[in-house]
């Protein structure tokens, strides 16, 4: 979060040949160019969803205060990948469920140990921000049970709708970080601008406040 207020740099989609601004509006204000796909559920016998063993505490164990969104500082998390190779950089995205505030961390690779280490660094920097995080059940998050200072839960495998808030924000980020494009050249400043475009947007679901405005209210109270 930029304590100096909204970033004044102009934003362009990541598929442009340069990170430099060419338009007077941010890409987040344009209609989303996302392909909507139906949720694909994997079914076993009897039509029930087929689930692998969870990596740790299941989403089913989350307390009710997380489900109703009335209590802030509970998050959903995942990775946004450019090139799908573990030795390639990616983005770890964390979305606060009540305010929709987004934290984005560039990671040099998405090995489980790397994801755990950099998330722990973020929690250690902002210990008051994080009560819980719910991740998907991907192998990248296998070491998250080692996290200290924050409760970790795991959604069921093949169930992205269980982290719908984070999935929605990841869709917005995809306007700046398209699939198949390496993130090696994406600078910290560019990632911050893309994140600010989401956090500074007035949203109907937030009564036309911004995610950053609401998040600041909660952490300062």
Could you say what each language-model-derived stretch is?
Residues 100-105, 154, 179:
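Short small-residue beta-strand/loop micro-motif enriched in glycine and branched aliphatics
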Residues 72-83:
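Two-metal-ion RNase H-like nuclease active-site motif
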Residues 124, 146-152, 158-221:
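Charged alpha-helix within mobile-element recombinases
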Residues 81-83, 87, 104-128:
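Active-site beta-loop-alpha junctions of metal-dependent nucleic acid enzymes
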Residues 67, 80, 87-103:
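Short conserved beta-strand segments at catalytic cores or DNA/RNA-binding microdomains
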Residues 128-143, 158:
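Acidic/histidine-rich, metal-coordinating catalytic segments
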Residues 6-67:
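Basic, flexible linker segments flanking DNA-binding modules
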Residues 1, 14, 78, 100, ...:
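Mobile genetic element proteins and their domesticated derivatives, centered on retroelements
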């Amino acid at each position: 979060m930029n304590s100096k207020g909204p970033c004044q740099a102009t934003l362009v989609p990541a598929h442009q040949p340069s990170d430099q601004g060419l338009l007077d509006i941010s890409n987040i204000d344009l209609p989303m160019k996302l392909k909507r796909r139906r949720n694909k559920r994997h079914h076993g016998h009897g039509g029930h969803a087929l689930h692998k063993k969870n990596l740790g505490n299941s989403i089913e164990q989350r307390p009710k205060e997380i489900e109703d969104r009335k209590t802030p500082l509970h998050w959903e998390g995942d990775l946004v990948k450019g090139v799908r190779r573990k030795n390639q950089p990616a983005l770890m995205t964390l979305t606060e469920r009540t305010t929709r505030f987004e934290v984005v961390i560039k990671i040099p690779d998405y090995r489980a140990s790397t994801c755990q280490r950099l998330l722990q660094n973020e929690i250690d920097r902002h210990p008051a921000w994080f009560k819980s995080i719910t991740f998907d059940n991907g192998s990248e998050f296998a070491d998250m049970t080692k996290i200290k200072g924050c409760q970790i839960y795991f959604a069921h495998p093949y169930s992205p709708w269980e982290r719908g808030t984070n999935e929605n924000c990841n869709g917005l980020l995809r306007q700046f970080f398209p699939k198949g494009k390496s993130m090696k050249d994406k600078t910290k400043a560019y990632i911050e601008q893309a994140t600010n475009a989401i956090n500074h947007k007035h949203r109907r679901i937030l009564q036309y406040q911004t995610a950053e405005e609401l998040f600041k209210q909660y952490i300062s109270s």
